[in-house]
Amino acid sequence: MLRTMLTAKIHRATVTQADLHYVGSVTIDADLLEAADLLPGEQVTIVDINNGARLETYAIAGPAGSGVIGINGAAARLVQPGDLVIIIAYGMMDDAEARRHVPRVLFVDAENRIIGRGHDPAEALPDDPSSLRGDLAVPGNPVTAAARRGTPTHQAPVALPASRTVVAPR
């Protein structure tokens, strides 16, 4: 059996351009592609944080160091310049590889410069007390309640019930 696993995530990138008349794809700064281990032509999912749109396309390399995140073709009707997006890539692997696999997670600033690197897909934004770990966002969790009240959430993880145990990659 093959499993589809997260291989890379560029978190909260800012869309710098959208061109309806360009032939498909998403243009991504070549430095970001390399740091995320994405190849030109690789399938990616784009999730627009501003409006909830979700689409699939393929990556093409933009000029290195430019910070470009360009939405091209029909997707430009769904995602606009200035929108925050998450760019996600998945890969298929057998069970043994999937259990060992560690994804690449990049955090970028408003100019799409890398401000953090990691391997934990649930990790909160670095130095952002308003962001919440994805695995702690469960009903009844005091950290979730604190986040909704605007209280800083970067604190020791709350013990999860056995049914919610998270196992770190080896």
Curated annotation (Swiss-Prot):
The keyword Lyase applies. The modification Pyruvic acid (Ser) is found at residue 25. GO terms for biological process: alanine biosynthetic process; pantothenate biosynthetic process. It comes from the Bacteria. Substrate binds at residues 57, 73-75. Its EC number is 4.1.1.11. It is found in: Cytoplasm. Pathway: Cofactor biosynthesis; (R)-pantothenate biosynthesis; beta-alanine from L-aspartate: step 1/1. Signal peptide: none annotated. Is synthesized initially as an inactive proenzyme, which is activated by self-cleavage at a specific serine bond to produce a beta-subunit with a hydroxyl group at its C-terminus and an alpha-subunit with a pyruvoyl group at its N-terminus. Keywords: Autocatalytic cleavage, Cytoplasm, Decarboxylase, Lyase, Pantothenate biosynthesis, Pyruvate, Schiff base, Zymogen. Binds 1 pyruvoyl group covalently per subunit. It catalyses: L-aspartate + H(+) = beta-alanine + CO2. Belongs to the PanD family. NCBIfam families: panD. Catalyzes the pyruvoyl-dependent decarboxylation of aspartate to produce beta-alanine. Heterooctamer of four alpha and four beta subunits. This is Aspartate 1-decarboxylase. It comes from Frankia alni (strain DSM 45986 / CECT 9034 / ACN14a).
